[in-house]
Amino acid sequence: MPKITAIQTIRTRAAGTWVIVKVLTDQPGLYGIGSASDHYRAKTVITTIETIAPLLIGRDAGHIEDIWQSIYTCGYWRNDSILNTVQAGIDMALWDIKGKEAGMPVYQLLGGPTRSAVMAYAHAAGDDLQALEDDVRRYMEEGYQVIRCQLGPYGGGGFIDAEQARLPKNHWGHSRVFDDEAYLENIPKMFAYLREKLGFGPKLTHDVHEHLQPTNAVTLAKLLEPYRLFFLEDLLPPEQIHWYRLVRQQCTTPQAMGELFINPHEWMPLITERLIDFVRVRVSKGGGITNCRKIATLCEWFGVRTAWQEGGDNDPVNQMAAVHLDLASSSFGIQEENHFRPEEYAAFPGHAVLEGGYLYANEQPGLGIDVDEDQARALLDPELAARSFYMAEDRRADGSIVRP
């Protein structure tokens, strides 16, 4: 059995927000890679990996579950974003090693394929209804069957200018204001327009990004019921998940939730009480393949489907880990798409192929994806990577922050 000899990190993308874990073994040429990317705390993730690495040196790389449990408890306090990310990156790398050692793709080790390809949904957006319609039609022509629809940025449709908002005389200088009532008016109008123009052929989704107050969130879910969404995403923040009981009592609009989840006690009640229809944990924030396959199995018995979170700040390795889970899981529902630049694809040979609304894995052993370290490091802009990044703040008229 191969033994772990070193754990390395490769920081890449222009802003340095991608962290790729590389686990080396005592068998020549046998290593695995995983995703430990964090858009806002990449340097913290790297430091944590360096702290945990001595615990794992000399361990059997095939003892994946045991190593997962060791990392989970090694700092006593657990279930936090950084630790989960570190845990996930190492876990993916160990599954990659296991697959290479066995000579088969990871999805085969997880029980074999339950489908030939992974259906993905596209991200359509526009600053006005016509631009959004055009973008939706473009994705339909590309073959996508499920398309997310947004009016501009997250919260779009709910932003009003300072004059409309009637800011207090001592306001803090914010010029763009998020208003719940504007959102409740404009998003149903958006879907009414799209259904009138496109009919009910395309399956449509929308991401609230947790911008609404809970009672208004319930109202929105009810207002969107006539438009038969594929799902309504992140209607409520993790702190307010108990409101999903009221959402379920009030309407049948399918709910997708979990992008910010890091703790089992966030997703477990929503799944076991059937309060959501899709769970959207990010594989690299949910503890990796080992833990996310357990989430997928739990979903299977309660009629909930998976929709692992991807989006623009994820990397090709995390995407590939999600694809392996999707292929092997009977509770799979849909996979969020992710587009990368040509030079980013070039740095990750063997990446998943996105075509016609489907993601395709390859038949190579392990995850089937590798990292070209020279090309990956060439993507890094040292000046940009030295900066700190923070989640953008949206505010209400009185200056209070809207939780993203």
Over which residues does each language-model region extend?
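N-terminal amphipathic alpha-helix/helix-capping segment at the start of soluble metabolic enzymes
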Residues: 1-14, 20, 99-100, 104-116, ...
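Metal- or metallocofactor-binding catalytic centers and their adjacent structured scaffolds
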Residues: 27-102, 398-403
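Metal-dependent enolase-superfamily TIM-barrel catalytic cores that perform enediolate-based chemistry
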Residues: 117-245
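Conserved, mostly hydrophobic/aromatic
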Residues: 4, 29, 52, 90, ...
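Structured beta-strand/loop patches that form or line metal/cofactor-binding pockets in enzymes
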Residues: 1-38, 340-346, 398-404
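Shared catalytic-loop signature of beta/alpha-barrel
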Residues: 23, 47, 52, 66, ...
